[in-house]
């Protein structure tokens, strides 16, 4: 296995639908080959989550876009929405690839944990026809479900969560916590 940090790549950026700078590493083998967009999990990073998976993609002749989800790594943002806003970021990356290369390339969306939920939520959107595959490894079903699970595991009062979660998501994060589910 080749170490991910030793592979040549290009730092690339795009803008999210709400104006944030999103960052990624582009591992380009052949501009006409399929592209895999890899989305990491909550408070993680793509190099850690895909240290083995990137090799599989590259060995199969695919190009890889290793993204930093919003509020992670080099991407801007302060709020993690558990896939609700991040799904639109996936669409921004698809549009980036289609405009830089061509909309004839085949694109796969691959995510782990929150990244898995993100790519599943993105699949609800009106994606271009060149998105051919979505793979979600151990996603959660919804933002509310995962937050409730963590709240219970940490013995926090669940009644307060049900009251404050929707309000704080809207006021602090600008999103509806129930807007989408994987």
Which residues does each PLM region occupy?
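Serine-hydrolase catalytic core
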Residues: 6, 12-16, 25, 169-182
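Short beta-strand element of the alpha/beta-hydrolase
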Residues: 33-41
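The serine-hydrolase catalytic nucleophile loop
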Residues: 42-56, 69
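Conserved alpha/beta-hydrolase
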Residues: 57-76
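Alpha/beta-hydrolase active-site loop
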Residues: 80-101
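Alpha/beta-hydrolase fold nucleophile elbow
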Residues: 101-113
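Hydrolase active-site cap/lid region
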Residues: 121-179
């Amino acid at each position: 296995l080749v170490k991910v940090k030793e592979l040549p790549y290009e730092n690339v950026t795009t803008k999210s639908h709400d104006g944030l700078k999103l960052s990624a590493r582009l591992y380009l083998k052949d501009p006409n080959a399929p592209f895999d967009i890899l989305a990491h999990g909550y408070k993680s990073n793509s190099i850690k989550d895909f240290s083995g998976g990137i090799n599989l993609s590259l060995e199969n002749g695919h190009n890889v876009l290793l993204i930093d989800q919003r509020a992670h790594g080099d991407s801007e943002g302060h709020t993690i929405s558990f896939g609700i806003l991040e799904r639109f970021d996936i669409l921004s990356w698809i549009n980036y690839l289609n405009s830089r290369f061509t909309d004839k390339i085949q694109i796969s969306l691959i995510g782990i944990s929150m990244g898995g939920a993100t790519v599943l939520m993105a699949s609800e959107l009106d994606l271009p026809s060149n998105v051919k595959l979505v793979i979600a490894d151990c996603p959660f079903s919804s933002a509310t479900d995962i937050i409730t699970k963590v709240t219970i595991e940490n013995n926090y009062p669940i009644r307060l969560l049900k009251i404050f979660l929707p309000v704080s998501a809207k006021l602090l994060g600008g999103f509806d916590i129930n807007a989408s589910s994987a």
